[in-house]
Design a protein with these regions (language model features):
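Gly/Ser-rich catalytic serine loop of serine hydrolases
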Residues: 169, 204-215, 295-296, 385-398
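Catalytic-core environment of secreted peptidases
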Residues: 184-197, 343-391, 428
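Inhibitory N-terminal propeptides of secreted protease zymogens
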Residues: 19-133
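Substrate-binding/access-modulating region of protease and related hydrolase catalytic domains
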Residues: 162, 224-227, 240-334, 360-363, ...
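Hydrolase catalytic cores
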Residues: 218-221, 241-245, 368, 372-434, ...
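Bacterial Sec-dependent N-terminal signal peptides
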Residues: 1-22
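Subtilisin-like serine protease catalytic core
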Residues: 22, 114, 149, 159-198, ...
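N-terminal domain-start motif of subtilase-like serine proteases
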Residues: 83-87, 102-103, 127-175, 198-210, ...
Length: 457
């Protein structure tokens, strides 16, 4: 009798797994369908902030900005599937269905170009945290403004930029990551101007739980406890966006990331700092190869390039594969018009884990490098720690990039990117380990001022 009951329980468990398994597919559209919107009236589909950033940089609203036809989405829903996310820039919609046979049904729709699998799994219920008490950092203050983060900021002369009064005020930064556990409770973020949050993976759920990575990343940018830790842009305005699903690695995370950068565009972000990168997934058939690192193959890289073309200054991590068999940068680090950031030690030598280039089409990557070994970060719980990774060199530089743009508002994103590379430590002899080298943000600032005065004359 015991064995029979055990069999029934196992059968029920397997049946439950089967019933709860879902498939998600990326649907590529041939076009966006009949439009009630047009590029002459962007206020109908773009936010005021997104339009303003384009106007400031003389970037025209284009077809890629137009929304996907609601009729198309209704027809997809009529196939019995749920709509998960979409990309207006890349004309795709991700749908979910409890049966993989949906693919053939979708392909029969006249407006569908192609369909590919991006995820398989089950819905996992999330438990919302109910902690409200403030977490205080118990660490002895040092006799300097930056505390334990001093080295990582001074390496790029960020302290000199700050002394000129440029600490990120008026700059909107979107941080795209896996989660920001305890950021809403740690006292080092009490004065941080967080304008809003967005959970792309689990819409409507908090970003302040489930993963600590984004907490550490944000601390490099936004922490503000003088003498203990001050980030590189403590006076900037922040949007915290979760695009990484910590439960596994599937191609759909590229769709989430694309949705995240489009959302960052919609709220008027000037800077994106992303410390996420991909090359292999739980399903090996979907892995990328070195030959795919063209900046055009990976879906996520296409989205990153579009963000750059919309006037957003995108910083992304090179990856931590330098001492693995892969060795190379990850995607979207292969994207042409963004700043890919490698990592160096305190002595400005390449960190052995920092991913290298070149891209498959021969371009230099990473673009630049910042301190990524023994970085000062804040962990959930309010603990100061040292951490390694291009995940941290990226926000350290991104924050100073925001300060530089604050100082030189007459320049566009491409010009700020060029200034950062032009005055880095090995700009005259760039390579595929550190790119143009470690930036000197004060030199970039002075050069930008000089160039600006020439323009005015």
């Amino acid at each position: 009798m015991k064995y029979w009951l055990l069999f029934l329980c196992l059968f029920a468990a397997v049946s439950s797994w089967s019933e709860n398994t879902y498939y998600r597919f990326r649907v590529y559209l041939k076009d966006k369908g009949n439009q009630t919107c047009n590029t002459d009236h962007p206020e109908a589909f773009l936010s005021e902030a997104a339009i303003l950033r384009r106007e400031q940089q003389q970037i025209h609203v284009s077809y890629s900005d137009l929304p996907i036809s609601s009729s198309y989405k209704e027809q997809l829903a009529n196939c019995g599937c749920a709509l998960i996310t979409e990309s207006r820039w890349l004309s795709t919609v991700v749908v979910e269905y409890p049966d993989s046979s949906l693919v053939e049904k979708l392909k029969q729709l006249a407006f569908v170009d192609s369909v590919c699998w991006v995820w398989k799994g089950k819905h996992i219920p999330l438990q919302e945290p109910d902690h409200t008490e403030t977490l205080h950092i118990d660490k002895k203050a040092l006799r300097n403004r930056y505390g334990y983060a001093q080295k990582q900021i001074r390496m790029m002369k960020g302290d000199k930029l700050h002394k000129q009064g440029f600490r990120g005020e008026g700059m909107r930064i979107a941080v795209i990551d896996a989660g920001f556990t305890d950021v809403n409770r740690i006292d080092a973020f009490a004065s941080t101007h967080i304008e809003g949050t967005r959970n792309i993976v689990y819409p409507g759920k908090t970003v302040y739980a489930s993963d600590a990575h984004g907490t550490k990343v944000l601390s490099c940018l936004a922490a503000n406890l003088p003498g203990i830790m001050t980030g590189t842009a403590p006076e900037a305005t922040y949007w915290l966006i979760k695009s990484e699903d910590s439960n596994g690695e599937s191609p759909i995370e590229q769709d989430y990331w694309a949705a995240a950068v489009e959302y960052a565009d919609s709220v008027g972000a000037y800077i994106i700092s992303s410390s996420l990168g991909y090359f292999d997934f739980d399903e090996p058939a979907t892995d990328y190869t070195h030959e795919d690192l063209t900046g055009r193959k990976a879906f996520i890289s296409q989205a990153a390039q579009m963000a750059a073309e919309k006037g957003i200054l995108v910083f992304t991590s090179a990856g931590n594969e330098g001492n693995t068999r892969w060795e190379k940068i990850t995607v979207p680090a292969d994207t042409p018009d963004i700043l890919t950031v490698g990592a160096v030690t305190e002595k400005q030598k390449r960190s052995d884990f920092s991913s290298i280039g070149p891209t498959a089409d021969g371009r230099i990557k990473p673009d630049v490098a910042a301190m990524g070994t023994n970085c000062c970060v804040i962990e959930p719980g309010g603990f100061i720690r040292q951490a390694n990774g291009t995940s941290f060199s990226t926000p350290i530089l991104a924050g100073l990039g925001a300060c530089l743009w604050q100082a030189l508002p007459q320049l566009n994103a491409a010009e700020i990117r060029a200034l950062i590379r032009q005055y880095a430590s090995q700009a005259k002899q760039p390579d595929n380990e550190l790119g143009y080298g470690v930036p000197n943000m004060y030199k970039s600032y002075k050069a930008g001022l000089k160039d600006g005065s020439k323009r005015r004359r």
